[in-house]
Amino acid sequence: MKKRMWRISLISQISDLLCLSRGSSSTLKTLTPFCFTLSRSPFHQSGGDDDASGLKNQLLRFRNDSGKVASVLERNKIQGAAFVELLRQLRPWPVLSQLVFDWRRNKALCDGLPMTADEYAKGITISGRLKNVDLALSLFHESANKTTSVYNALMGAYLCNGLSHHCEQLFLDFNSQQDGPSSSTPSVSTYNILISLYGRLIMVERMESVFLQLQQLNILPDSSTYNNLIAGYIYAWDWDKMEATFHSMKNGLVKPTLATYLLMLRGYANSGNLLRMEDMYQAVKRHVDRNEIKLIESMICAYYRSCHKDRIRKIKTLSKLIPKKSYKPWLYLLLMQVYAKDDNLHAMENFIDQAITKGLQIETDGIMRSIVASYFRCNAVDKLAKFVQRANSAGWKMSRSMFHGLMIMYGSQKRFKEMENVLSEMESFKISRSKKTLCILLRVYAATHGQEHKVNQVAGMMLKHGHDFQRPEASKRVMGK
């Protein structure tokens, strides 16, 4: 009963969040563990700048034509807070954002309309997202008024480009200037960036130290602070602290956001806690099914690693939510292996066909053994023979176990000619005969009346190669690989 009440309560909370978020895919893509500022939250109220929204729609129509973009901007003469709002709304289109920012920067240089610190901060952020760190640094130096938002923007640019040392050093420089003439001081967003930085580096003690410092400075943490802590614990596989942080949010002043629940879903999937994962998924199912392919992939992996009795059905259901064009190579291989272990030859061969069509190559023994074992258990020797030929043509790794499976299956059906042809195929693939290869031949012939001369031939070959063996009795059945 308690579990049912927890689930109902959770679904109720998430439903409210989904209503607030309006289900916008482009907005919710910003809900990563590394969001630093409140303005990047879908719950942030921008003031309803209709002018910026209308201008954004005009610019989107001409986003592939820099000349027309400039013409639209010239007609509207936008700057200051309205320009910052426009760049905020253009965030899902970084290339267009860069064109718009370049226009504003040129206006400042040519027409003497100085840019504000917030405009520079947006430009630095855009450059960071486009992996142009040099431009981001140039804009930082160009900004005469280095406010907290300007420092945060460059720290964020360093962070998203993997320049952790530069990010850390910039914070130290920023922090050391508090006693100088500048009145700018680190904000909660500054510390959020540091928490995210140390979380990515799996430096949990430093991450927690930054959070403690934040509290000692009486700076109130926000949802991004806790989300970045949770993300750090997920990186470090510290599931207890992940869950403790989540519960502290539920019981505290800063309540979980949709981003928090998505993080917890990932954490439960990674930890293999299927019960909690399924509860969390049901709560955010509508959003996840539409927008979160990576989370769906994480859940598929969680079921794959588990011994859940209904895992095949659940994996099949989840995989249908991913568009075929979005399938990653590893997902084809995982699904191939899942259906192989379930002896579902039709589904397995369907994914084999797709993998070959897409030019994927398998070089892993485990996957090949799973496929061969599935054909073996289903006694589908002709299908296995066809698969061997197709796998070879596709450049997949050929192993001795594949040919051993063919030999055993042909032998069990007394198709001796085809069984012996397998030996020739092995030679063509430069796969040598092992003791096991000869043992398979010996047992097949010994189990068949009238094949004593073949038994003697194989026994002679084994002695020639120095293999010890016991002559099997004729009554023995053909044994497995």
Curated annotation (Swiss-Prot):
- Quote the PANTHER family the UniProt record gives: EXPRESSED PROTEIN, OS05G0407900 PROTEIN
Please give the PROSITE patterns that the UniProt record associates with this protein. Answer: PPR
One short Pfam name that applies is PPR
Instruction: Spell out the protein name for this chain.
Output: Pentatricopeptide repeat-containing protein At2g48000
Keywords in alphabetical order: Repeat
User: Which GO MF term does the entry hold, naming one?
Assistant: mRNA binding
Per-repeat ranges for PPR: 147-181, 187-221, 222-256, 257-287, 292-324, 328-362, 364-398, 399-433, 434-469
Q: Which family does the entry's similarity section mention?
A: Belongs to the PPR family. P subfamily.
Domain of life, per lineage: Eukaryota
